[in-house]
Amino acid sequence: MFVFTYPAEKYDELNIRKTDILHLINKHITVASALKKKMDYYEGEQAILERKKEDGAPNNKLVCNHAKDISDTATSYFIGEPVTYKSDDDISDLLKALENAGADEADGDNGLDLSIYGLAFEYMYAKEGQTELVCKNLSPLRTFMVYDDTIEQNELFAVYYYRKKDDTDTYPTQYIATVLTQNYKYVLNIQDSNEPQETTEEPQPHYMGEVPVNAYQNNKLGIGDFELQIPLIDAYNAIMSDRVNDKEQFVDSILAIYGALLSDEIEDEGEGTGTQKAMKKLKREKLLELPDDSKAEYLTHTFDEAGVEILRKAIEQDIH
């Protein structure tokens, strides 16, 4: 898991530099490509769909979505029941505040993100003009936490960003980045450029007293629940796809005739070569007459169904 760091001695929450934030965003985009692969697998966009074969060869691409099964099951066990809070003191006001903040929904989203990405981010804020807090899950594809470079790895600030949509492609890429420090919130408009950019946006105090984003890890290394099983998932998809391919190849087997020509004495079968006419007649009549010293058989690929089934079950067991 990549950890974003910033020199502690250079950090000033009242002097956030756009060039630094842009550099961090570009690094996160690289990290996010690996995270996106995990979401692709969860959604069924898996490697088997990119497989290519020679023209004419069966190329079924079956996705047996074990990734989704694993994450949905793990999330149900982990956060299927809402989180409960107990205290010797009266915390009814706190529970009411958490309910109003949408904590249960955020917990569910966080649990699924932890299972898929190995990471989750939760943003706590007050809506404009209101005092009640709101909990919102932020996508790890567009969110990261930055720590200082000390041994304690203290949280300095969190960044949530997105690319400003411009379908004309006539202007340089721009990012809208929300930077959340211990005391302030910045909303920065950053151009994807090597030119220096001055931070003209004024920070707004958020009154939380700490970075209002919680960063969670599924485990110490931030590994998702099915991440290490991806090679096995690919192997399972390949086996199931090849199984269907072999069945199709069996149906499309080549007819081999020894000691005779299929096109002998074929007439009135329309256009085409003698062999093509013979094949039309054979398909229609389902009957083949051959001399005594000749024979016919289908050339088929030997398919060890029992062996493949044993391998399939072994891989499936390893996945789970």
For each predicted feature, which ranges?
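Solvent-exposed, flexible loop/coil residues
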Residues: 102, 107, 121, 142-148, ...
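Short stretches within intrinsically disordered, low-complexity N-terminal or propeptide regions
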Residues: 49, 76, 160, 179, ...
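Extended, charged amphipathic alpha-helical segments
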Residues: 201-320
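N-terminal start-of-domain structural block
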Residues: 1-36, 188-222, 236
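Extended hydrophobic/Leu-rich segments
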Residues: 11-14, 21, 25, 39-42, ...
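Short, well-ordered loop/turn elements at secondary-structure boundaries
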Residues: 116-119, 153-156, 251, 284
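Extended, helix-rich architectural segments
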Residues: 1-135
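Extended, regular secondary-structure scaffolds
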Residues: 109-111, 121-223
